[in-house]
């Protein structure tokens, strides 16, 4: 990208763009790359005209990104929201998906315009301590997401085997399937993207089948989708709303998408090509997230219809009088509202609509868990390489992430019961929401910087919308923490929560400060933080890192 965005000499320091020098034609990925080892060429077509051939060439990164909108954590969140609030939170699902699309649009633009992913840009701009803390929070989000994939896959195996495979056995099986995907990765980028497209299709068909047989009330569904209200809602519904946001807009997915778009050959010396790539990636992401929204809608609507205000005794009676009567004992015989999870959800569908519904549910759940496995591996590797400039093999990276995910999960599976495992899934959704500022604030910061994005920097409308998203997320998270802390079981937990809250608020405050600089608060830019106004000092560009 031509042009130095810095001001005249200030104390001997020059500032400018971080974009790597553009070079027409094929761009080779660095040695040791994974997804980026292969570049997809973009066909030449008439300039300015929409082309399906070009759209097909750009198709891939958006659908891989959309898998994070369909992992077992989302499925758990959907069915819990339906069971707890009926159709009342469908509008939260809709707008969370829209906000997710806006965040992913910014991530894709950053990758296309600069040729760098979000982790790499964070490495260049943030000082060492905030940078390391930021990296740790994203790694925590990745491990949390991987735990959800392990839980979902283990429960799917248990359902498909009629309980013959114990939960801990299903957890251990996930070690094997991970390495199967590493093997599949060797067959080429387009084949890998096609395979994940196949898994998304399986989810659409299986959960769509459940929607058809459940026949939700369409009038109430449309009202819940387009009228933003929640009459009679309390803390349980709030927890589900936070869980929906955390499950839909996942922190590591923003880092992932900014790197995935680099797999397409885009001549960044031509601004028309950059503008065109941004357009096609936005169209692809919109299509992909529309599909993911429909799948999530299917699940939430099915359980809003079948489970809302259902009692344990009613669920017991339904199963006791069905061909799956052996499963009836998983529901206590009392009049409390049933607390459904992804295991009980499959069972009650089978009791209501026949065994086929149970097995079809399990297949969809298995596809959700499997499809998320490889994208989590890619996200972990891109984040590690971007923040730390540390290159690990795919095998080593997936071994680290999956080991961190499996150890606590298998302990819960062995020593606790299924309800604890599903409860862990719910808490992981809330964790994703709490960690969301550590992805949204950096992407908003860097896409608002003319020194980084040149003429493609966020305009006023985009800044206002993105900032509103951030304020909303922070407000919901703060309200959740204030509501949750009094329910802690022991006073000793308060000191731990206070310590974590101090670190959380400290890092968030720093990220907000740097973000405000890029939004026009120039008085906050002191010393080395002038880079957030003018770009990276030239000596730091040459060294490829920040000082400190």
UniProtKB/Swiss-Prot annotation:
Q: Which residues lie on this side of the membrane: Cytoplasmic?
A: 1-55, 103-139, 185-193, 257-284, 367-397, 448-463, 514-548
List localization entries: Late endosome membrane; Lysosome membrane
Alphabetic keyword roster: Endosome, Glycoprotein, Ion transport, Iron, Iron transport, Lysosome, Membrane, Transmembrane, Transmembrane helix, Transport
Q: How does it sit in the membrane?
A: Multi-pass membrane protein
Q: Listed GO molecular functions? A: cadmium ion transmembrane transporter activity; iron ion transmembrane transporter activity; manganese ion transmembrane transporter activity; metal cation:proton antiporter activity
- The source organism is Cervus elaphus
Q: What is the official name of this protein in its record?
A: Natural resistance-associated macrophage protein 1
- For the keyword DNA repair, the answer is no
In residue numbers, the region (Disordered) covers 1-38
The record, for InterPro entries, names: NRAMP_fam
What Gene Ontology terms for biological process does this UniProt record contain?
iron ion transport; manganese ion transport
Write out the transmembrane intervals: 56-73, 83-102, 140-160, 165-184, 194-214, 238-256, 285-304, 347-366, 398-415, 427-447, 464-485, 494-513
Q: Which residues lie on this side of the membrane: Extracellular?
A: 74-82, 161-164, 215-237, 305-346, 416-426, 486-493
GO cellular component, as recorded: late endosome membrane; lysosomal membrane; phagocytic vesicle membrane; plasma membrane
**Glycosylated residues (UniProt):** 321, 335
Q: What task does this protein carry out?
A: Macrophage-specific antiporter that fluxes metal ions in either direction against a proton gradient. Localized to late endosomal lysosomal membranes, delivers bivalent cations from the cytosol into these acidic compartments where they may directly affect antimicrobial activity. Involved in iron metabolism and host natural resistance to infection with intracellular parasites.
- Sorted alphabetically, which PANTHER family does this protein's record hold? NATURAL RESISTANCE-ASSOCIATED MACROPHAGE PROTEIN 1 (PTHR11706:SF52), SOLUTE CARRIER PROTEIN FAMILY 11 MEMBER (PTHR11706)
Which HAMAP family does its entry note? NRAMP
Question: What does the record give as the reaction this protein catalyses?
Answer: Zn(2+)(in) + H(+)(out) = Zn(2+)(out) + H(+)(in); Fe(2+)(in) + H(+)(out) = Fe(2+)(out) + H(+)(in); Mn(2+)(in) + H(+)(out) = Mn(2+)(out) + H(+)(in)
> Cystine bridges: which residues?
none
**Protein family membership:** Belongs to the NRAMP family.
Q: Tell me where on the tree of life, at the top rank, the source sits.
A: Eukaryota
């Amino acid at each position: 990208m031509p042009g130095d965005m810095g001001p005249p000499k200030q104390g001997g320091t020059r500032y400018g763009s971080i974009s790597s020098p553009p070079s027409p034609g094929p761009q080779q990925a660095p040695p040791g790359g994974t997804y980026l080892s292969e570049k997809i060429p973009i066909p030449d077509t008439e300039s300015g005209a929409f082309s399906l051939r070009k759209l097909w060439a750009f198709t891939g990164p958006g659908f891989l990104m959309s898998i994070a909108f369909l992992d077992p954590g989302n499925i758990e969140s959907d069915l819990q929201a339906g069971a707890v609030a009926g159709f009342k939170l469908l509008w939260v699902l809709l707008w969370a998906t829209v906000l997710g699309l806006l965040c992913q649009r910014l991530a894709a633009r950053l990758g296309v315009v600069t040729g760098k992913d979000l982790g790499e840009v964070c490495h260049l701009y943030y000082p060492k301590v905030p940078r390391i803390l930021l990296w740790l929070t994203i790694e925590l989000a990745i491990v949390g997401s991987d735990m959800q994939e392990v839980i979902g896959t283990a429960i799917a195996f248990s359902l498909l085997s009629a309980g013959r495979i114990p939960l801990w056995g299903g957890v251990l099986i996930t070690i094997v399937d991970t390495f199967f995907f590493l093997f599949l990765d060797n067959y080429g980028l387009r084949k890998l993207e096609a395979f994940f497209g196949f898994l998304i299709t399986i989810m659409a068909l299986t959960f769509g089948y459940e929607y058809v047989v459940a026949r939700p009330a369409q009038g109430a569904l449309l009202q819940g989708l387009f009228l933003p209200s929640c009459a009679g809602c309390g803390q349980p519904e709030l927890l589900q709303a936070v869980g929906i946001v955390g499950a839909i807009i996942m922190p590591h997915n923003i880092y992932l998408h900014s790197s995935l778009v680099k797999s397409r050959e885009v001549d960044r010396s031509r601004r028309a090509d950059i503008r065109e790539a941004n357009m096609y990636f936005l169209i692809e992401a919109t299509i992909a997230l529309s599909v993911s929204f429909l799948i999530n809608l299917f699940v939430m609507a099915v359980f809003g219809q079948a489970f809302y205000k259902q009692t344990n005794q009613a669920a017991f009676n339904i199963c006791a009088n069905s061909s799956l009567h052996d499963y009836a004992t998983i529901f206590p015989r009392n009049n409390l509202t049933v607390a459904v999870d992804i295991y009980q959800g499959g069972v009650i569908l089978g009791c209501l609509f026949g065994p086929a519904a149970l097995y079809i549910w399990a297949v969809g759940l298995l596809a959700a868990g499997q499809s998320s496995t490889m994208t989590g591996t890619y996200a972990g590797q891109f984040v590690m390489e971007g923040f730390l400039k540390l290159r690990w093999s795919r095998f080593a990276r997936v071994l680290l992430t999956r080991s961190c995910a499996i150890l606590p999960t298998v302990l819960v599976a062995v020593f606790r019961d299924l309800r604890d495992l599903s409860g862990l899934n719910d808490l992981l959704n809330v964790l994703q929401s709490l960690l969301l500022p550590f992805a949204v604030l950096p992407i908003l910061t860097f896409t608002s910087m003319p020194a980084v994005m040149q003429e493609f920097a966020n305009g006023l409308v985009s800044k206002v919308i993105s900032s509103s998203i951030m304020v909303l997320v922070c407000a919901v998270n703060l309200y959740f923490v204030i509501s949750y802390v009094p329910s802690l079981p022991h006073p000793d937990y308060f000191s731990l929560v206070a310590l974590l809250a101090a670190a959380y608020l400290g890092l968030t405050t720093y990220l907000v400060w740097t973000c405000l600089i890029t939004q026009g608060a120039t008085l906050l830019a002191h010393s080395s933080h002038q880079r957030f106004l003018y770009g990276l000092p030239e000596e730091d560009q040459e060294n490829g890192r920040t000082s400190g």
